[in-house]
Amino acid sequence: MRTLWIVAVLLVGVEGSMYELGKMILLETGKNAATSYIAYGCNCGVGRRGQPLDATDRCCYVHKCCYKKLTGCNPLTDRYSHSLKNKTIVCGENKPCLKEMCECDKALAICLGKNVNTYNKNYKITMKMFCKKPDAC
C-alpha cells in the first residue's frame, strides 16, 4: 500500500493546487484522492479525457472544463489558499485566477461528495483505450 501511495504522489504531484484539491476531496468524500481517483474512469487524473462513464467521472470531466477556462495560472504549479467555515470550503484568494482555480476544485470536491454513491470500483483504473472521444466543453 505504501508503494501505491508513493506512485500516486509521483503521478499526481503534491505541488500547486493538487495538495489543496486532495484535502477538499477527502473532506467531501472521505476518500483519499490519490488512491481513489488517480485513474478513475476516463476523466479523473492528469491528462485523462473521454466520455464520462458515470456521475463520478462526469464530476472530473466538468472539472477539466473548468480548468480550461483559467487564464494566468497553472493548476499543477500554482497554489491558492482556502479555509473551512462551518464545514464549508471557502476560497480565500485575492488573485482572480487563483480564486477561480480554487472554486473549480471546490466544485469538484462537492460533486464527488454528492455522487460518492456512484463510485464504481471497476472504474478505479480505466485504460485510456477504453475511453471514447469526449464532447467539447
UniProtKB/Swiss-Prot annotation:
Residues 1-16 form the signal peptide. The record marks 127, 130 as: Hydrophobic membrane-disruption site (MDiS). GO terms for cellular component: extracellular region. The record marks 128, 133 as: Cationic membrane-docking site (MDoS). Residues 121-133 are annotated as: Important for membrane-damaging activities in eukaryotes and bacteria. It is found in: Secreted. Transmembrane segments: none annotated. InterPro entries: PLipase_A2, PLipase_A2_Asp_AS, PLipase_A2_dom, PLipase_A2_dom_sf, PLipase_A2_His_AS. Expressed by the venom gland. GO terms for biological process: arachidonate secretion; lipid catabolic process; phospholipid metabolic process. GO terms for molecular function: calcium ion binding; calcium-dependent phospholipase A2 activity; phospholipid binding; toxin activity. It comes from the Eukaryota. The record marks 121, 124 as: Important residue of the cationic membrane-docking site (MDoS). Disulfide bonds join 42-131, 44-60, 59-111, 65-137, 66-104, 73-97, 91-102. The keyword Transcription does not apply. SUPFAM superfamilies: Phospholipase A2, PLA2. Keywords: Disulfide bond, Myotoxin, Secreted, Signal, Toxin. SMART domains: PA2c. PROSITE patterns: PA2_ASP, PA2_HIS. Homodimer; non-covalently linked. Snake venom phospholipase A2 that lacks enzymatic activity. Is myotoxic, and displays edema-inducing activities. A model of myotoxic mechanism has been proposed: an apo Lys49-PLA2 is activated by the entrance of a hydrophobic molecule (e.g. fatty acid) at the hydrophobic channel of the protein leading to a reorientation of a monomer. Belongs to the phospholipase A2 family. Group II subfamily. K49 sub-subfamily. This is Basic phospholipase A2 homolog Bsc-K49. It comes from Bothriechis schlegelii (Eyelash palm pitviper).
